[in-house]
Amino acid sequence: MLIIEDKELKDRVEILRKEIKNRNLNGIIIYSDEYRSGYCTYFTGYKPINVIEESPQTLIVMENEDPILVIGRLNYYSARETVWIKNILQHHKFDTEISTMLKKFNKKGSKIGIAGEHLMPFYLRDLFTKAMPDVNFPIVTEILDDMRKIKSPQEIFLMEKAAEINDKVLTELKSIIKIGMTEQQVVAHADFLGRQMGADLGSATVVMSGKNTKFPAWRATDKKINKGELVMVDFNPAIGYYCNDGGLTFLMPGASKYKSDALKNSHKIIKKTINSIRSQTKATNVHDSFYDLLKPLSLEPNFSPYVTGTRGTGHGVGLDVVEFPDLNKFSNFIFYPNMTFAIKLDLHDLEGEGLRVEQVVQITEEGVKPLNKLALNNSDDWAIL
């Protein structure tokens, strides 16, 4: 089935309880919002929809207590019937009955961890402090990051399905994109095709053309695609809430040899780099491979200034399109089997434009298993129209 079964969700909570005990915590409060739902969806199997409300999730797991899920009032009704957790409350009651309920956990010397603190609004943190003034609240988001970074067989199965749809959509777009179309029209085709194939959208579809490709992200406009321009498509379908982040750049007819060569070389380089990834090696090897392959081609200046920050060469992928760990020039953590990453090569200032080739892979004992296969299985000039 295209979901995570309740048994796996419950097992995750039990693993979490053991980690809480190992850290001498009395409980944990996990927060996520509807745009980055992964921290709570990982345990609940529910992803809120943003209808006419903001609908975060808050999961409260205290020692020797059943878990409590707090969710927005409109999502509450479907969550109550579909989520395995029995104690489900409404978010707008946080400052009344939920705060009153939390007071029983207010004990001197108690420690209740907070996860997802970078998403949690100040007013909610203040409510916890007011309800439990004698409790210490250490930040323990790394517990969840460590759990989520290693994927289960079912998680990878869902991610494979999402990747297959991404590859199919980008393949269809190759014959659809034409000079004179707008960025918004390309988004419309991508989103329609993805949904027609059964996918949800993990995040907004990014389509940028020409001068707009200089940005790391861009909301599609009515700008028309012109002759010889690079057209970047970053499409993120999701199956069972598990995302794919495969992106390609198309080159319109009439382009310069310089841009054509840069795009062909980017495909060649990402193939070599992905095939070189090994378990038990440092993540910085991704950057180093890109650098070593770009330098002889005089493309290193189009790469190096842009890879020191967040997501410079990729990132983890799963319930969220972008999740821990981050890949950049300084990411010296170790690759382990069943971690999943978007491996991303961005080149900038190519006659004032930029390109991206991004493919999601699973780390294995032997090396990598590509989940996206489009850029890896086709010729280096495949995206040149």
Question: What are the residue ranges of the model-derived segments?
Answer:
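Active-site neighborhoods and metal-handling regions in enzymes and metal-associated proteins
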Residues: 1-385
